[in-house]
Amino acid sequence: MLSFARRFQTIAAPTGQRAINPENPMRLIKLPIAALILAFAQSPHAANAENKTPEADAGKALSAFFDAEWDYEMQQNPAQASSLGDRRWNDRWSDRSLEAIQKDEHHTTDALARFTKIDRTRLSAADQLNYDLFKKDLEMEIDGFKFRTYLMPISQRGGLQTLDELGDRLRFETVKDYEDWIARLRSLPALFEQEMTLMREGAKTHVMWPKIVLSRIPAQIDKQIVSKPEESPFFKPFKKFPDSIPNGDRERLTKSASEAIASGVLPSFQKLKRYFVEEYLPAAFDQVGVWQMPQGAEFYAYLARRHTTTTLTPQQIHEKGLSEVARIHAEMQAVMEKVGFKGTLPEFFTKLRTDPQFFYKTPEELLEAYRALAKRIDPNLVKVFKTLPRTPYGVTPIPDKIAPDTTTAYYSQPAADGSRAGVYFVNLYKPETRPKWEMMALSLHESVPGHHLQIALAQELGDIPKFRRYGGYTAFVEGWGLYAESLGQEMGLYDDPYSRFGQLTYEMWRAVRLVVDTGMHHMKWDRQRAIDFFMANAPKAENDIVNEIDRYISMPGQALAYKIGELKIKELRDRARAALGERFELREFHDAVLLSGAVPLDVLERNIDAWIATRKAASTSTPATAKP
């Protein structure tokens, strides 16, 4: 899972399609956004575009437009800009008023008409792709306006109660860095009022998450309500200053931060807690699917299209999931027999969940083991990859305050300016529920060759617009992550039957998602039925399974992307191998998949078909040796 769609649902959320606004987890930062288009449309470049300029001029105009758009989007989403290393708006939050949101929507709708006046035929092939992706994203965003997802800005995976985590993503090197953070602390009460206004409207119109997941939030808010300002998570940057900041400034900054927290931050959390417990939570649904929201069936079908980048219906996805579950069961059975277990598959699951030999005793041991796995994986990448990213990554624990309520692990992308490496966050809560046999598959997914390799490579691509370099499509990003787990076999990393079973467990986990996500949100399953199906088909710990099901409840449709994307990548790999025979080279195939950045699955298919045609046409004196 990804942090910029992942935990700006706890400040950078599980992978969604683009980055997610930390002040509103459900709003995907479209990076192609309306008012930016307006900014371009009002610029000199717009006239050239609308007058159908020659290819060179049209390309320059489009490039200038994308640059202007990126800047505007960052200005509208300051926390996102800060997370990417852009400090220009470090002293503020987004405007989350209803008026600002409605203005944005109006601009987006108006802007699409202006954007389509750009003559696509005058653009190069590469810019035509950029144009098409931008236009498709914009149309998808407009299609989603009717669902008013901005009215549910808080879930157990993030919202106001996790905004302090932005501080962990920032550099505090100068006096201004600290002053900017203090300015943000002082403006938090206004942000809380705006978000609570949205929540009130959501409760009134039944656009909110179900009670079962919202009930986790009061305990999270409680961790923000401390007796002294110095105990607040927002005070953390002031506990250690760089040597370059004089003592006098340190004292002044520390005093200002304490005053801002005492006078504004703590009262805001107290007010949020009262409203949440007394009014918001009681208004929530008891059932779990989005089918009960206004236009719920249409909303879920929209989310399925958005996250999978396909036209598959929820029913088709459900049936595909059942088929995959049956296939993977057969492979699990074979591994169980290989280790000599005498019993049924459910009994083997119980052994894997409970046998002490499969677990570390302490969080410290678990973290050390994750870091050792990373060191083992890295040198094996060259076996299956030709191009590797320059940006490093680290392995870090998930913050204690959210670990009980979140998933097994997630990834947070590097800063755009290179000031922060990628981070593979691992959950150390209850190590007795985190089996050794799952750790390799999990690490391959979240770090390398999964999310870190794919996202860091995309960020290092210099020839695509920023909205593509730092954005993504759930089906591509998470499909790649799941596909990366299977590469452990080519890399020689599944060197015992249990780690291989762990890989199958993780594949089964994603197949189960197709069934339970559509089950709850389309077929009206209750939560317990989803938990029971998961428990019966995958040996993950019950605590993990419950957290996963609750994640699907508050992130409808996102979990569909993993298996759908992985199946497409494997289909294209098989197609390429069949077409190229001895000329098929796995490392070059991976370049063909990754070096255009994240794209919708239909675009990926066109890219690979073009790569196959080019490879077939190329003359070579020495045929390549076929690789698996």
Predicted regions and their residues:
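N-terminal maturation segment of proteins
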Residues: A47-P628
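Bacterial N-terminal signal peptides that target proteins for export
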Residues: A5-I11, A19-I33
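Intrinsically disordered, low-complexity serine/threonine-rich segments
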Residues: R6-R7, I11-A13, S43-A46, A624
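Long alpha-helical scaffolds
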Residues: A13, L28, D405-A409
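Bacterial N-terminal signal peptides
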Residues: K30-S43
